[in-house]
Curated annotation (Swiss-Prot):
Its main location: cytoplasm. One of its GO terms (cellular component) is cytoplasm. Keywords: Cytoplasm, NADP, Oxidoreductase, PHB biosynthesis. It comes from Shinella zoogloeoides (Crabtreella saccharophila). GO terms for biological process: lipid metabolic process; monocarboxylic acid metabolic process; poly-hydroxybutyrate biosynthetic process. This is Acetoacetyl-CoA reductase. Belongs to the short-chain dehydrogenases/reductases (SDR) family. The gene is phaB.
Amino acid sequence: MSRVALVTGGSRGIGAAISIALKAAGYKVAASYAGNDDAAKPFKAETGIAVYKWDVSSYEACVEGIAKVEADLGPIDVLVNNAGITKDAMFHKMTPDQWNAVINTNLTGLFNMTHPVWSGMRDRSFGRIVNISSINGQKGQMGQANYSAAKAGDLGFTKALAQEGAAKGITVNAICPGYIGTEMVRAIPEKVLNERIIPQIPVGRLGEPDEIARIVVFLASDEAGFITGSTISANGGQFFV
């Protein structure tokens, strides 16, 4: 029987690449999204991947959404916490709403999504959780105190939960992408990309969403069962921990 994978923020950008790669690897895949129907509908039509709409910042919405996925596809074996938002501002101009929105989605969202699937993974003695953090959770980024704090929190969550899951066959790992060539990044003016961003990256290029997706597929596999609590940096050498 095929294992079931759920990817949050799974219909666009890195999340879409992850969803597609997991399906190609033989998983039954569900992709959740929060609000972009214009992206989700063609994604479903083009890939055949089931899409579900809910906001990961709401625990109740996550419980309800996960129940729908499991009713349709079966118990979730692989959870990829990819959903995230930005509300950038210099700290002296940042509002409580900007802070809370990012923390609630990018950090609390991991609790909201993982908690409802955790008991089932424990009962089945198998689970794979992959948290998509960020290079900015490792090094910080000016104008992103909220985002950097949330993504750093994702790494602490990963390490703590890995210790709890290890004896039950559950691995918990994180990936910290650097600049990846998503639609959002490629919308940055070419002059800025070529003169300010790419020179920071020793390999001399942006990463590709598929490169992140391939890491996820490996971490979700049986072959990665001895890897847990790890953070994989995928940033072209831009930052070393």
